[in-house]
Regions:
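WD40 beta-propeller blade core
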Residues: 6, 46, 86, 131, ...
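Loop/turn-rich, solvent-exposed surfaces of beta-rich toroidal or solenoidal domains
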Residues: 209-224, 228-262
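Short loop/turn segments that connect beta-strands within beta-propeller blades
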Residues: 9-12, 49-52, 89-93, 135-138, ...
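Tandem repeat domain/solenoid detector
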Residues: 14, 43-44, 54, 58, ...
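Hydrophilic extracytoplasmic domains
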Residues: 214, 236, 255-258, 263-310
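Structural signature of WD-repeat beta-propellers
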Residues: 1, 40-41, 80-81, 125-126, ...
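Extracytoplasmic beta-rich repeat domains
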Residues: 16-32, 55-72, 95-118, 143-167, ...
Length: 310
């Protein structure tokens, strides 16, 4: 968040390069064709060379960018905190198109990370909707409501989609706060199935399961076919779990106290645990060569071999 960007060797942890951008960074890092894409708290979007960190492109947007831009072909897709989805062409100062969602009075601080599927840019918004926008025209291809606001207070009616949307084939898996986890047809937005859940970290897929960490600490494996729940683990209640990440035959999550937990993808039993430090790790973990790469909230970048976990 302090404007430092570094490239670290996944093999041995050596630093390959480091740059200071002198601006606060607020989103993750996107990658496409040897370039990195980042968003800033000052309402900026940047493209850096993945080889040396040199800034290749810099544009201004209407609000801070809290998630990594998505890039596909000739389009850079940016989601902003004020409910907009923007389509930039490389090198352009202004977006070619803008989609603006309805922003509720009260929302969580965050946004989903947009993805590109075929000709559509797909993102979740604070009003509980998933929207697909044609990247070439900026027209809405479809909308699907995942979270339905309920209750008398603005807090009760928060239904943000802030977590990751997972694509597998033609299916999309998405979860909302105080709403549902659902499977959608990526071509039409048609809802294939849904289950009640409240999540701010989104979904992941493995072993025929759709994994979701509920805000109450329940980690669930829903059958990808929509035929119910394969298993649920309630041992990590209210520990603010990170997005579940499949790796090998396990699913991994980090809690608010800095503990990494490994669960069996088959039955959800906890099979390993390690202390990664004094902080949580809200950034998505990366499964790499049968292990995990974790970026902790305190700025540490860690690589774990699963065989070393107790």
């Amino acid at each position: 968040s302090d404007g430092e960007v570094a490239a670290i060797s996944a093999a041995d942890g050596d630093r390959l390069w480091r740059v200071e951008l002198e601006r606060p960074l607020s989103g993750g890092v996107g990658y496409y064709d040897r370039s990195l894409y980042l968003g800033g708290a000052d309402g900026s979007v940047l493209q850096l060379s993945a080889d040396d960190g040199v800034v290749e492109w810099d544009a201004a947007v209407s609000s801070e960018v809290l998630a990594a831009p998505a890039v596909s072909g000739d389009w850079i897709i940016v989601q902003t905190y004020d409910g907009k989805l923007l389509g930039f062409q490389p090198g352009a100062d202004e977006p070619a198109w803008t989609f603006t969602s309805d922003v509720p009075v009260l929302t969580l601080r965050g946004t989903s990370t947009p993805i590109v599927v075929g000709a559509n840019a797909i993102a979740g918004f604070g009003d509980g909707k998933v929207v697909a926008v044609d990247v070439n025209s900026g027209n809405v291809s479809w909308e699907s409501r995942i979270g339905i606001p309920q209750g008398s207070s603005e807090i009760d009616r928060i239904v943000d989609i802030d977590g990751a949307i997972t694509q597998q084939g033609i299916e999309l898996f998405v979860a909302s706060y105080q709403g549902r986890v659902a499977a959608l047809d990526s071509r039409t937005g048609r809802k294939l199935w849904q289950q009640n859940v409240s999540s701010v970290t989104g979904t992941h897929v493995g072993f025929g399961n759709v994994y979701v960490a509920d805000v109450d600490g329940t980690l669930s494996a829903f059958l990808r076919t929509g035929q119910g729940v394969r298993w649920q683990n309630i041992e990590l209640g209210y520990r603010q779990l990170s997005r579940p990440t499949p790796v090998s035959s396990y699913v991994a999550t980090v809690d608010f106290d800095g503990y990494l937990h490994l669960l069996s993808q088959v039955d959800g039993q906890i099979v390993g645990r390690a202390k990664i430090g004094g902080d949580a790790a809200r950034a998505d973990m990366i499964a790499h060569n049968g292990g995990l790469i974790i970026f902790a909230d305190n700025g540490q970048l860690l690589a774990y071999d699963l065989e070393t976990l107790d």
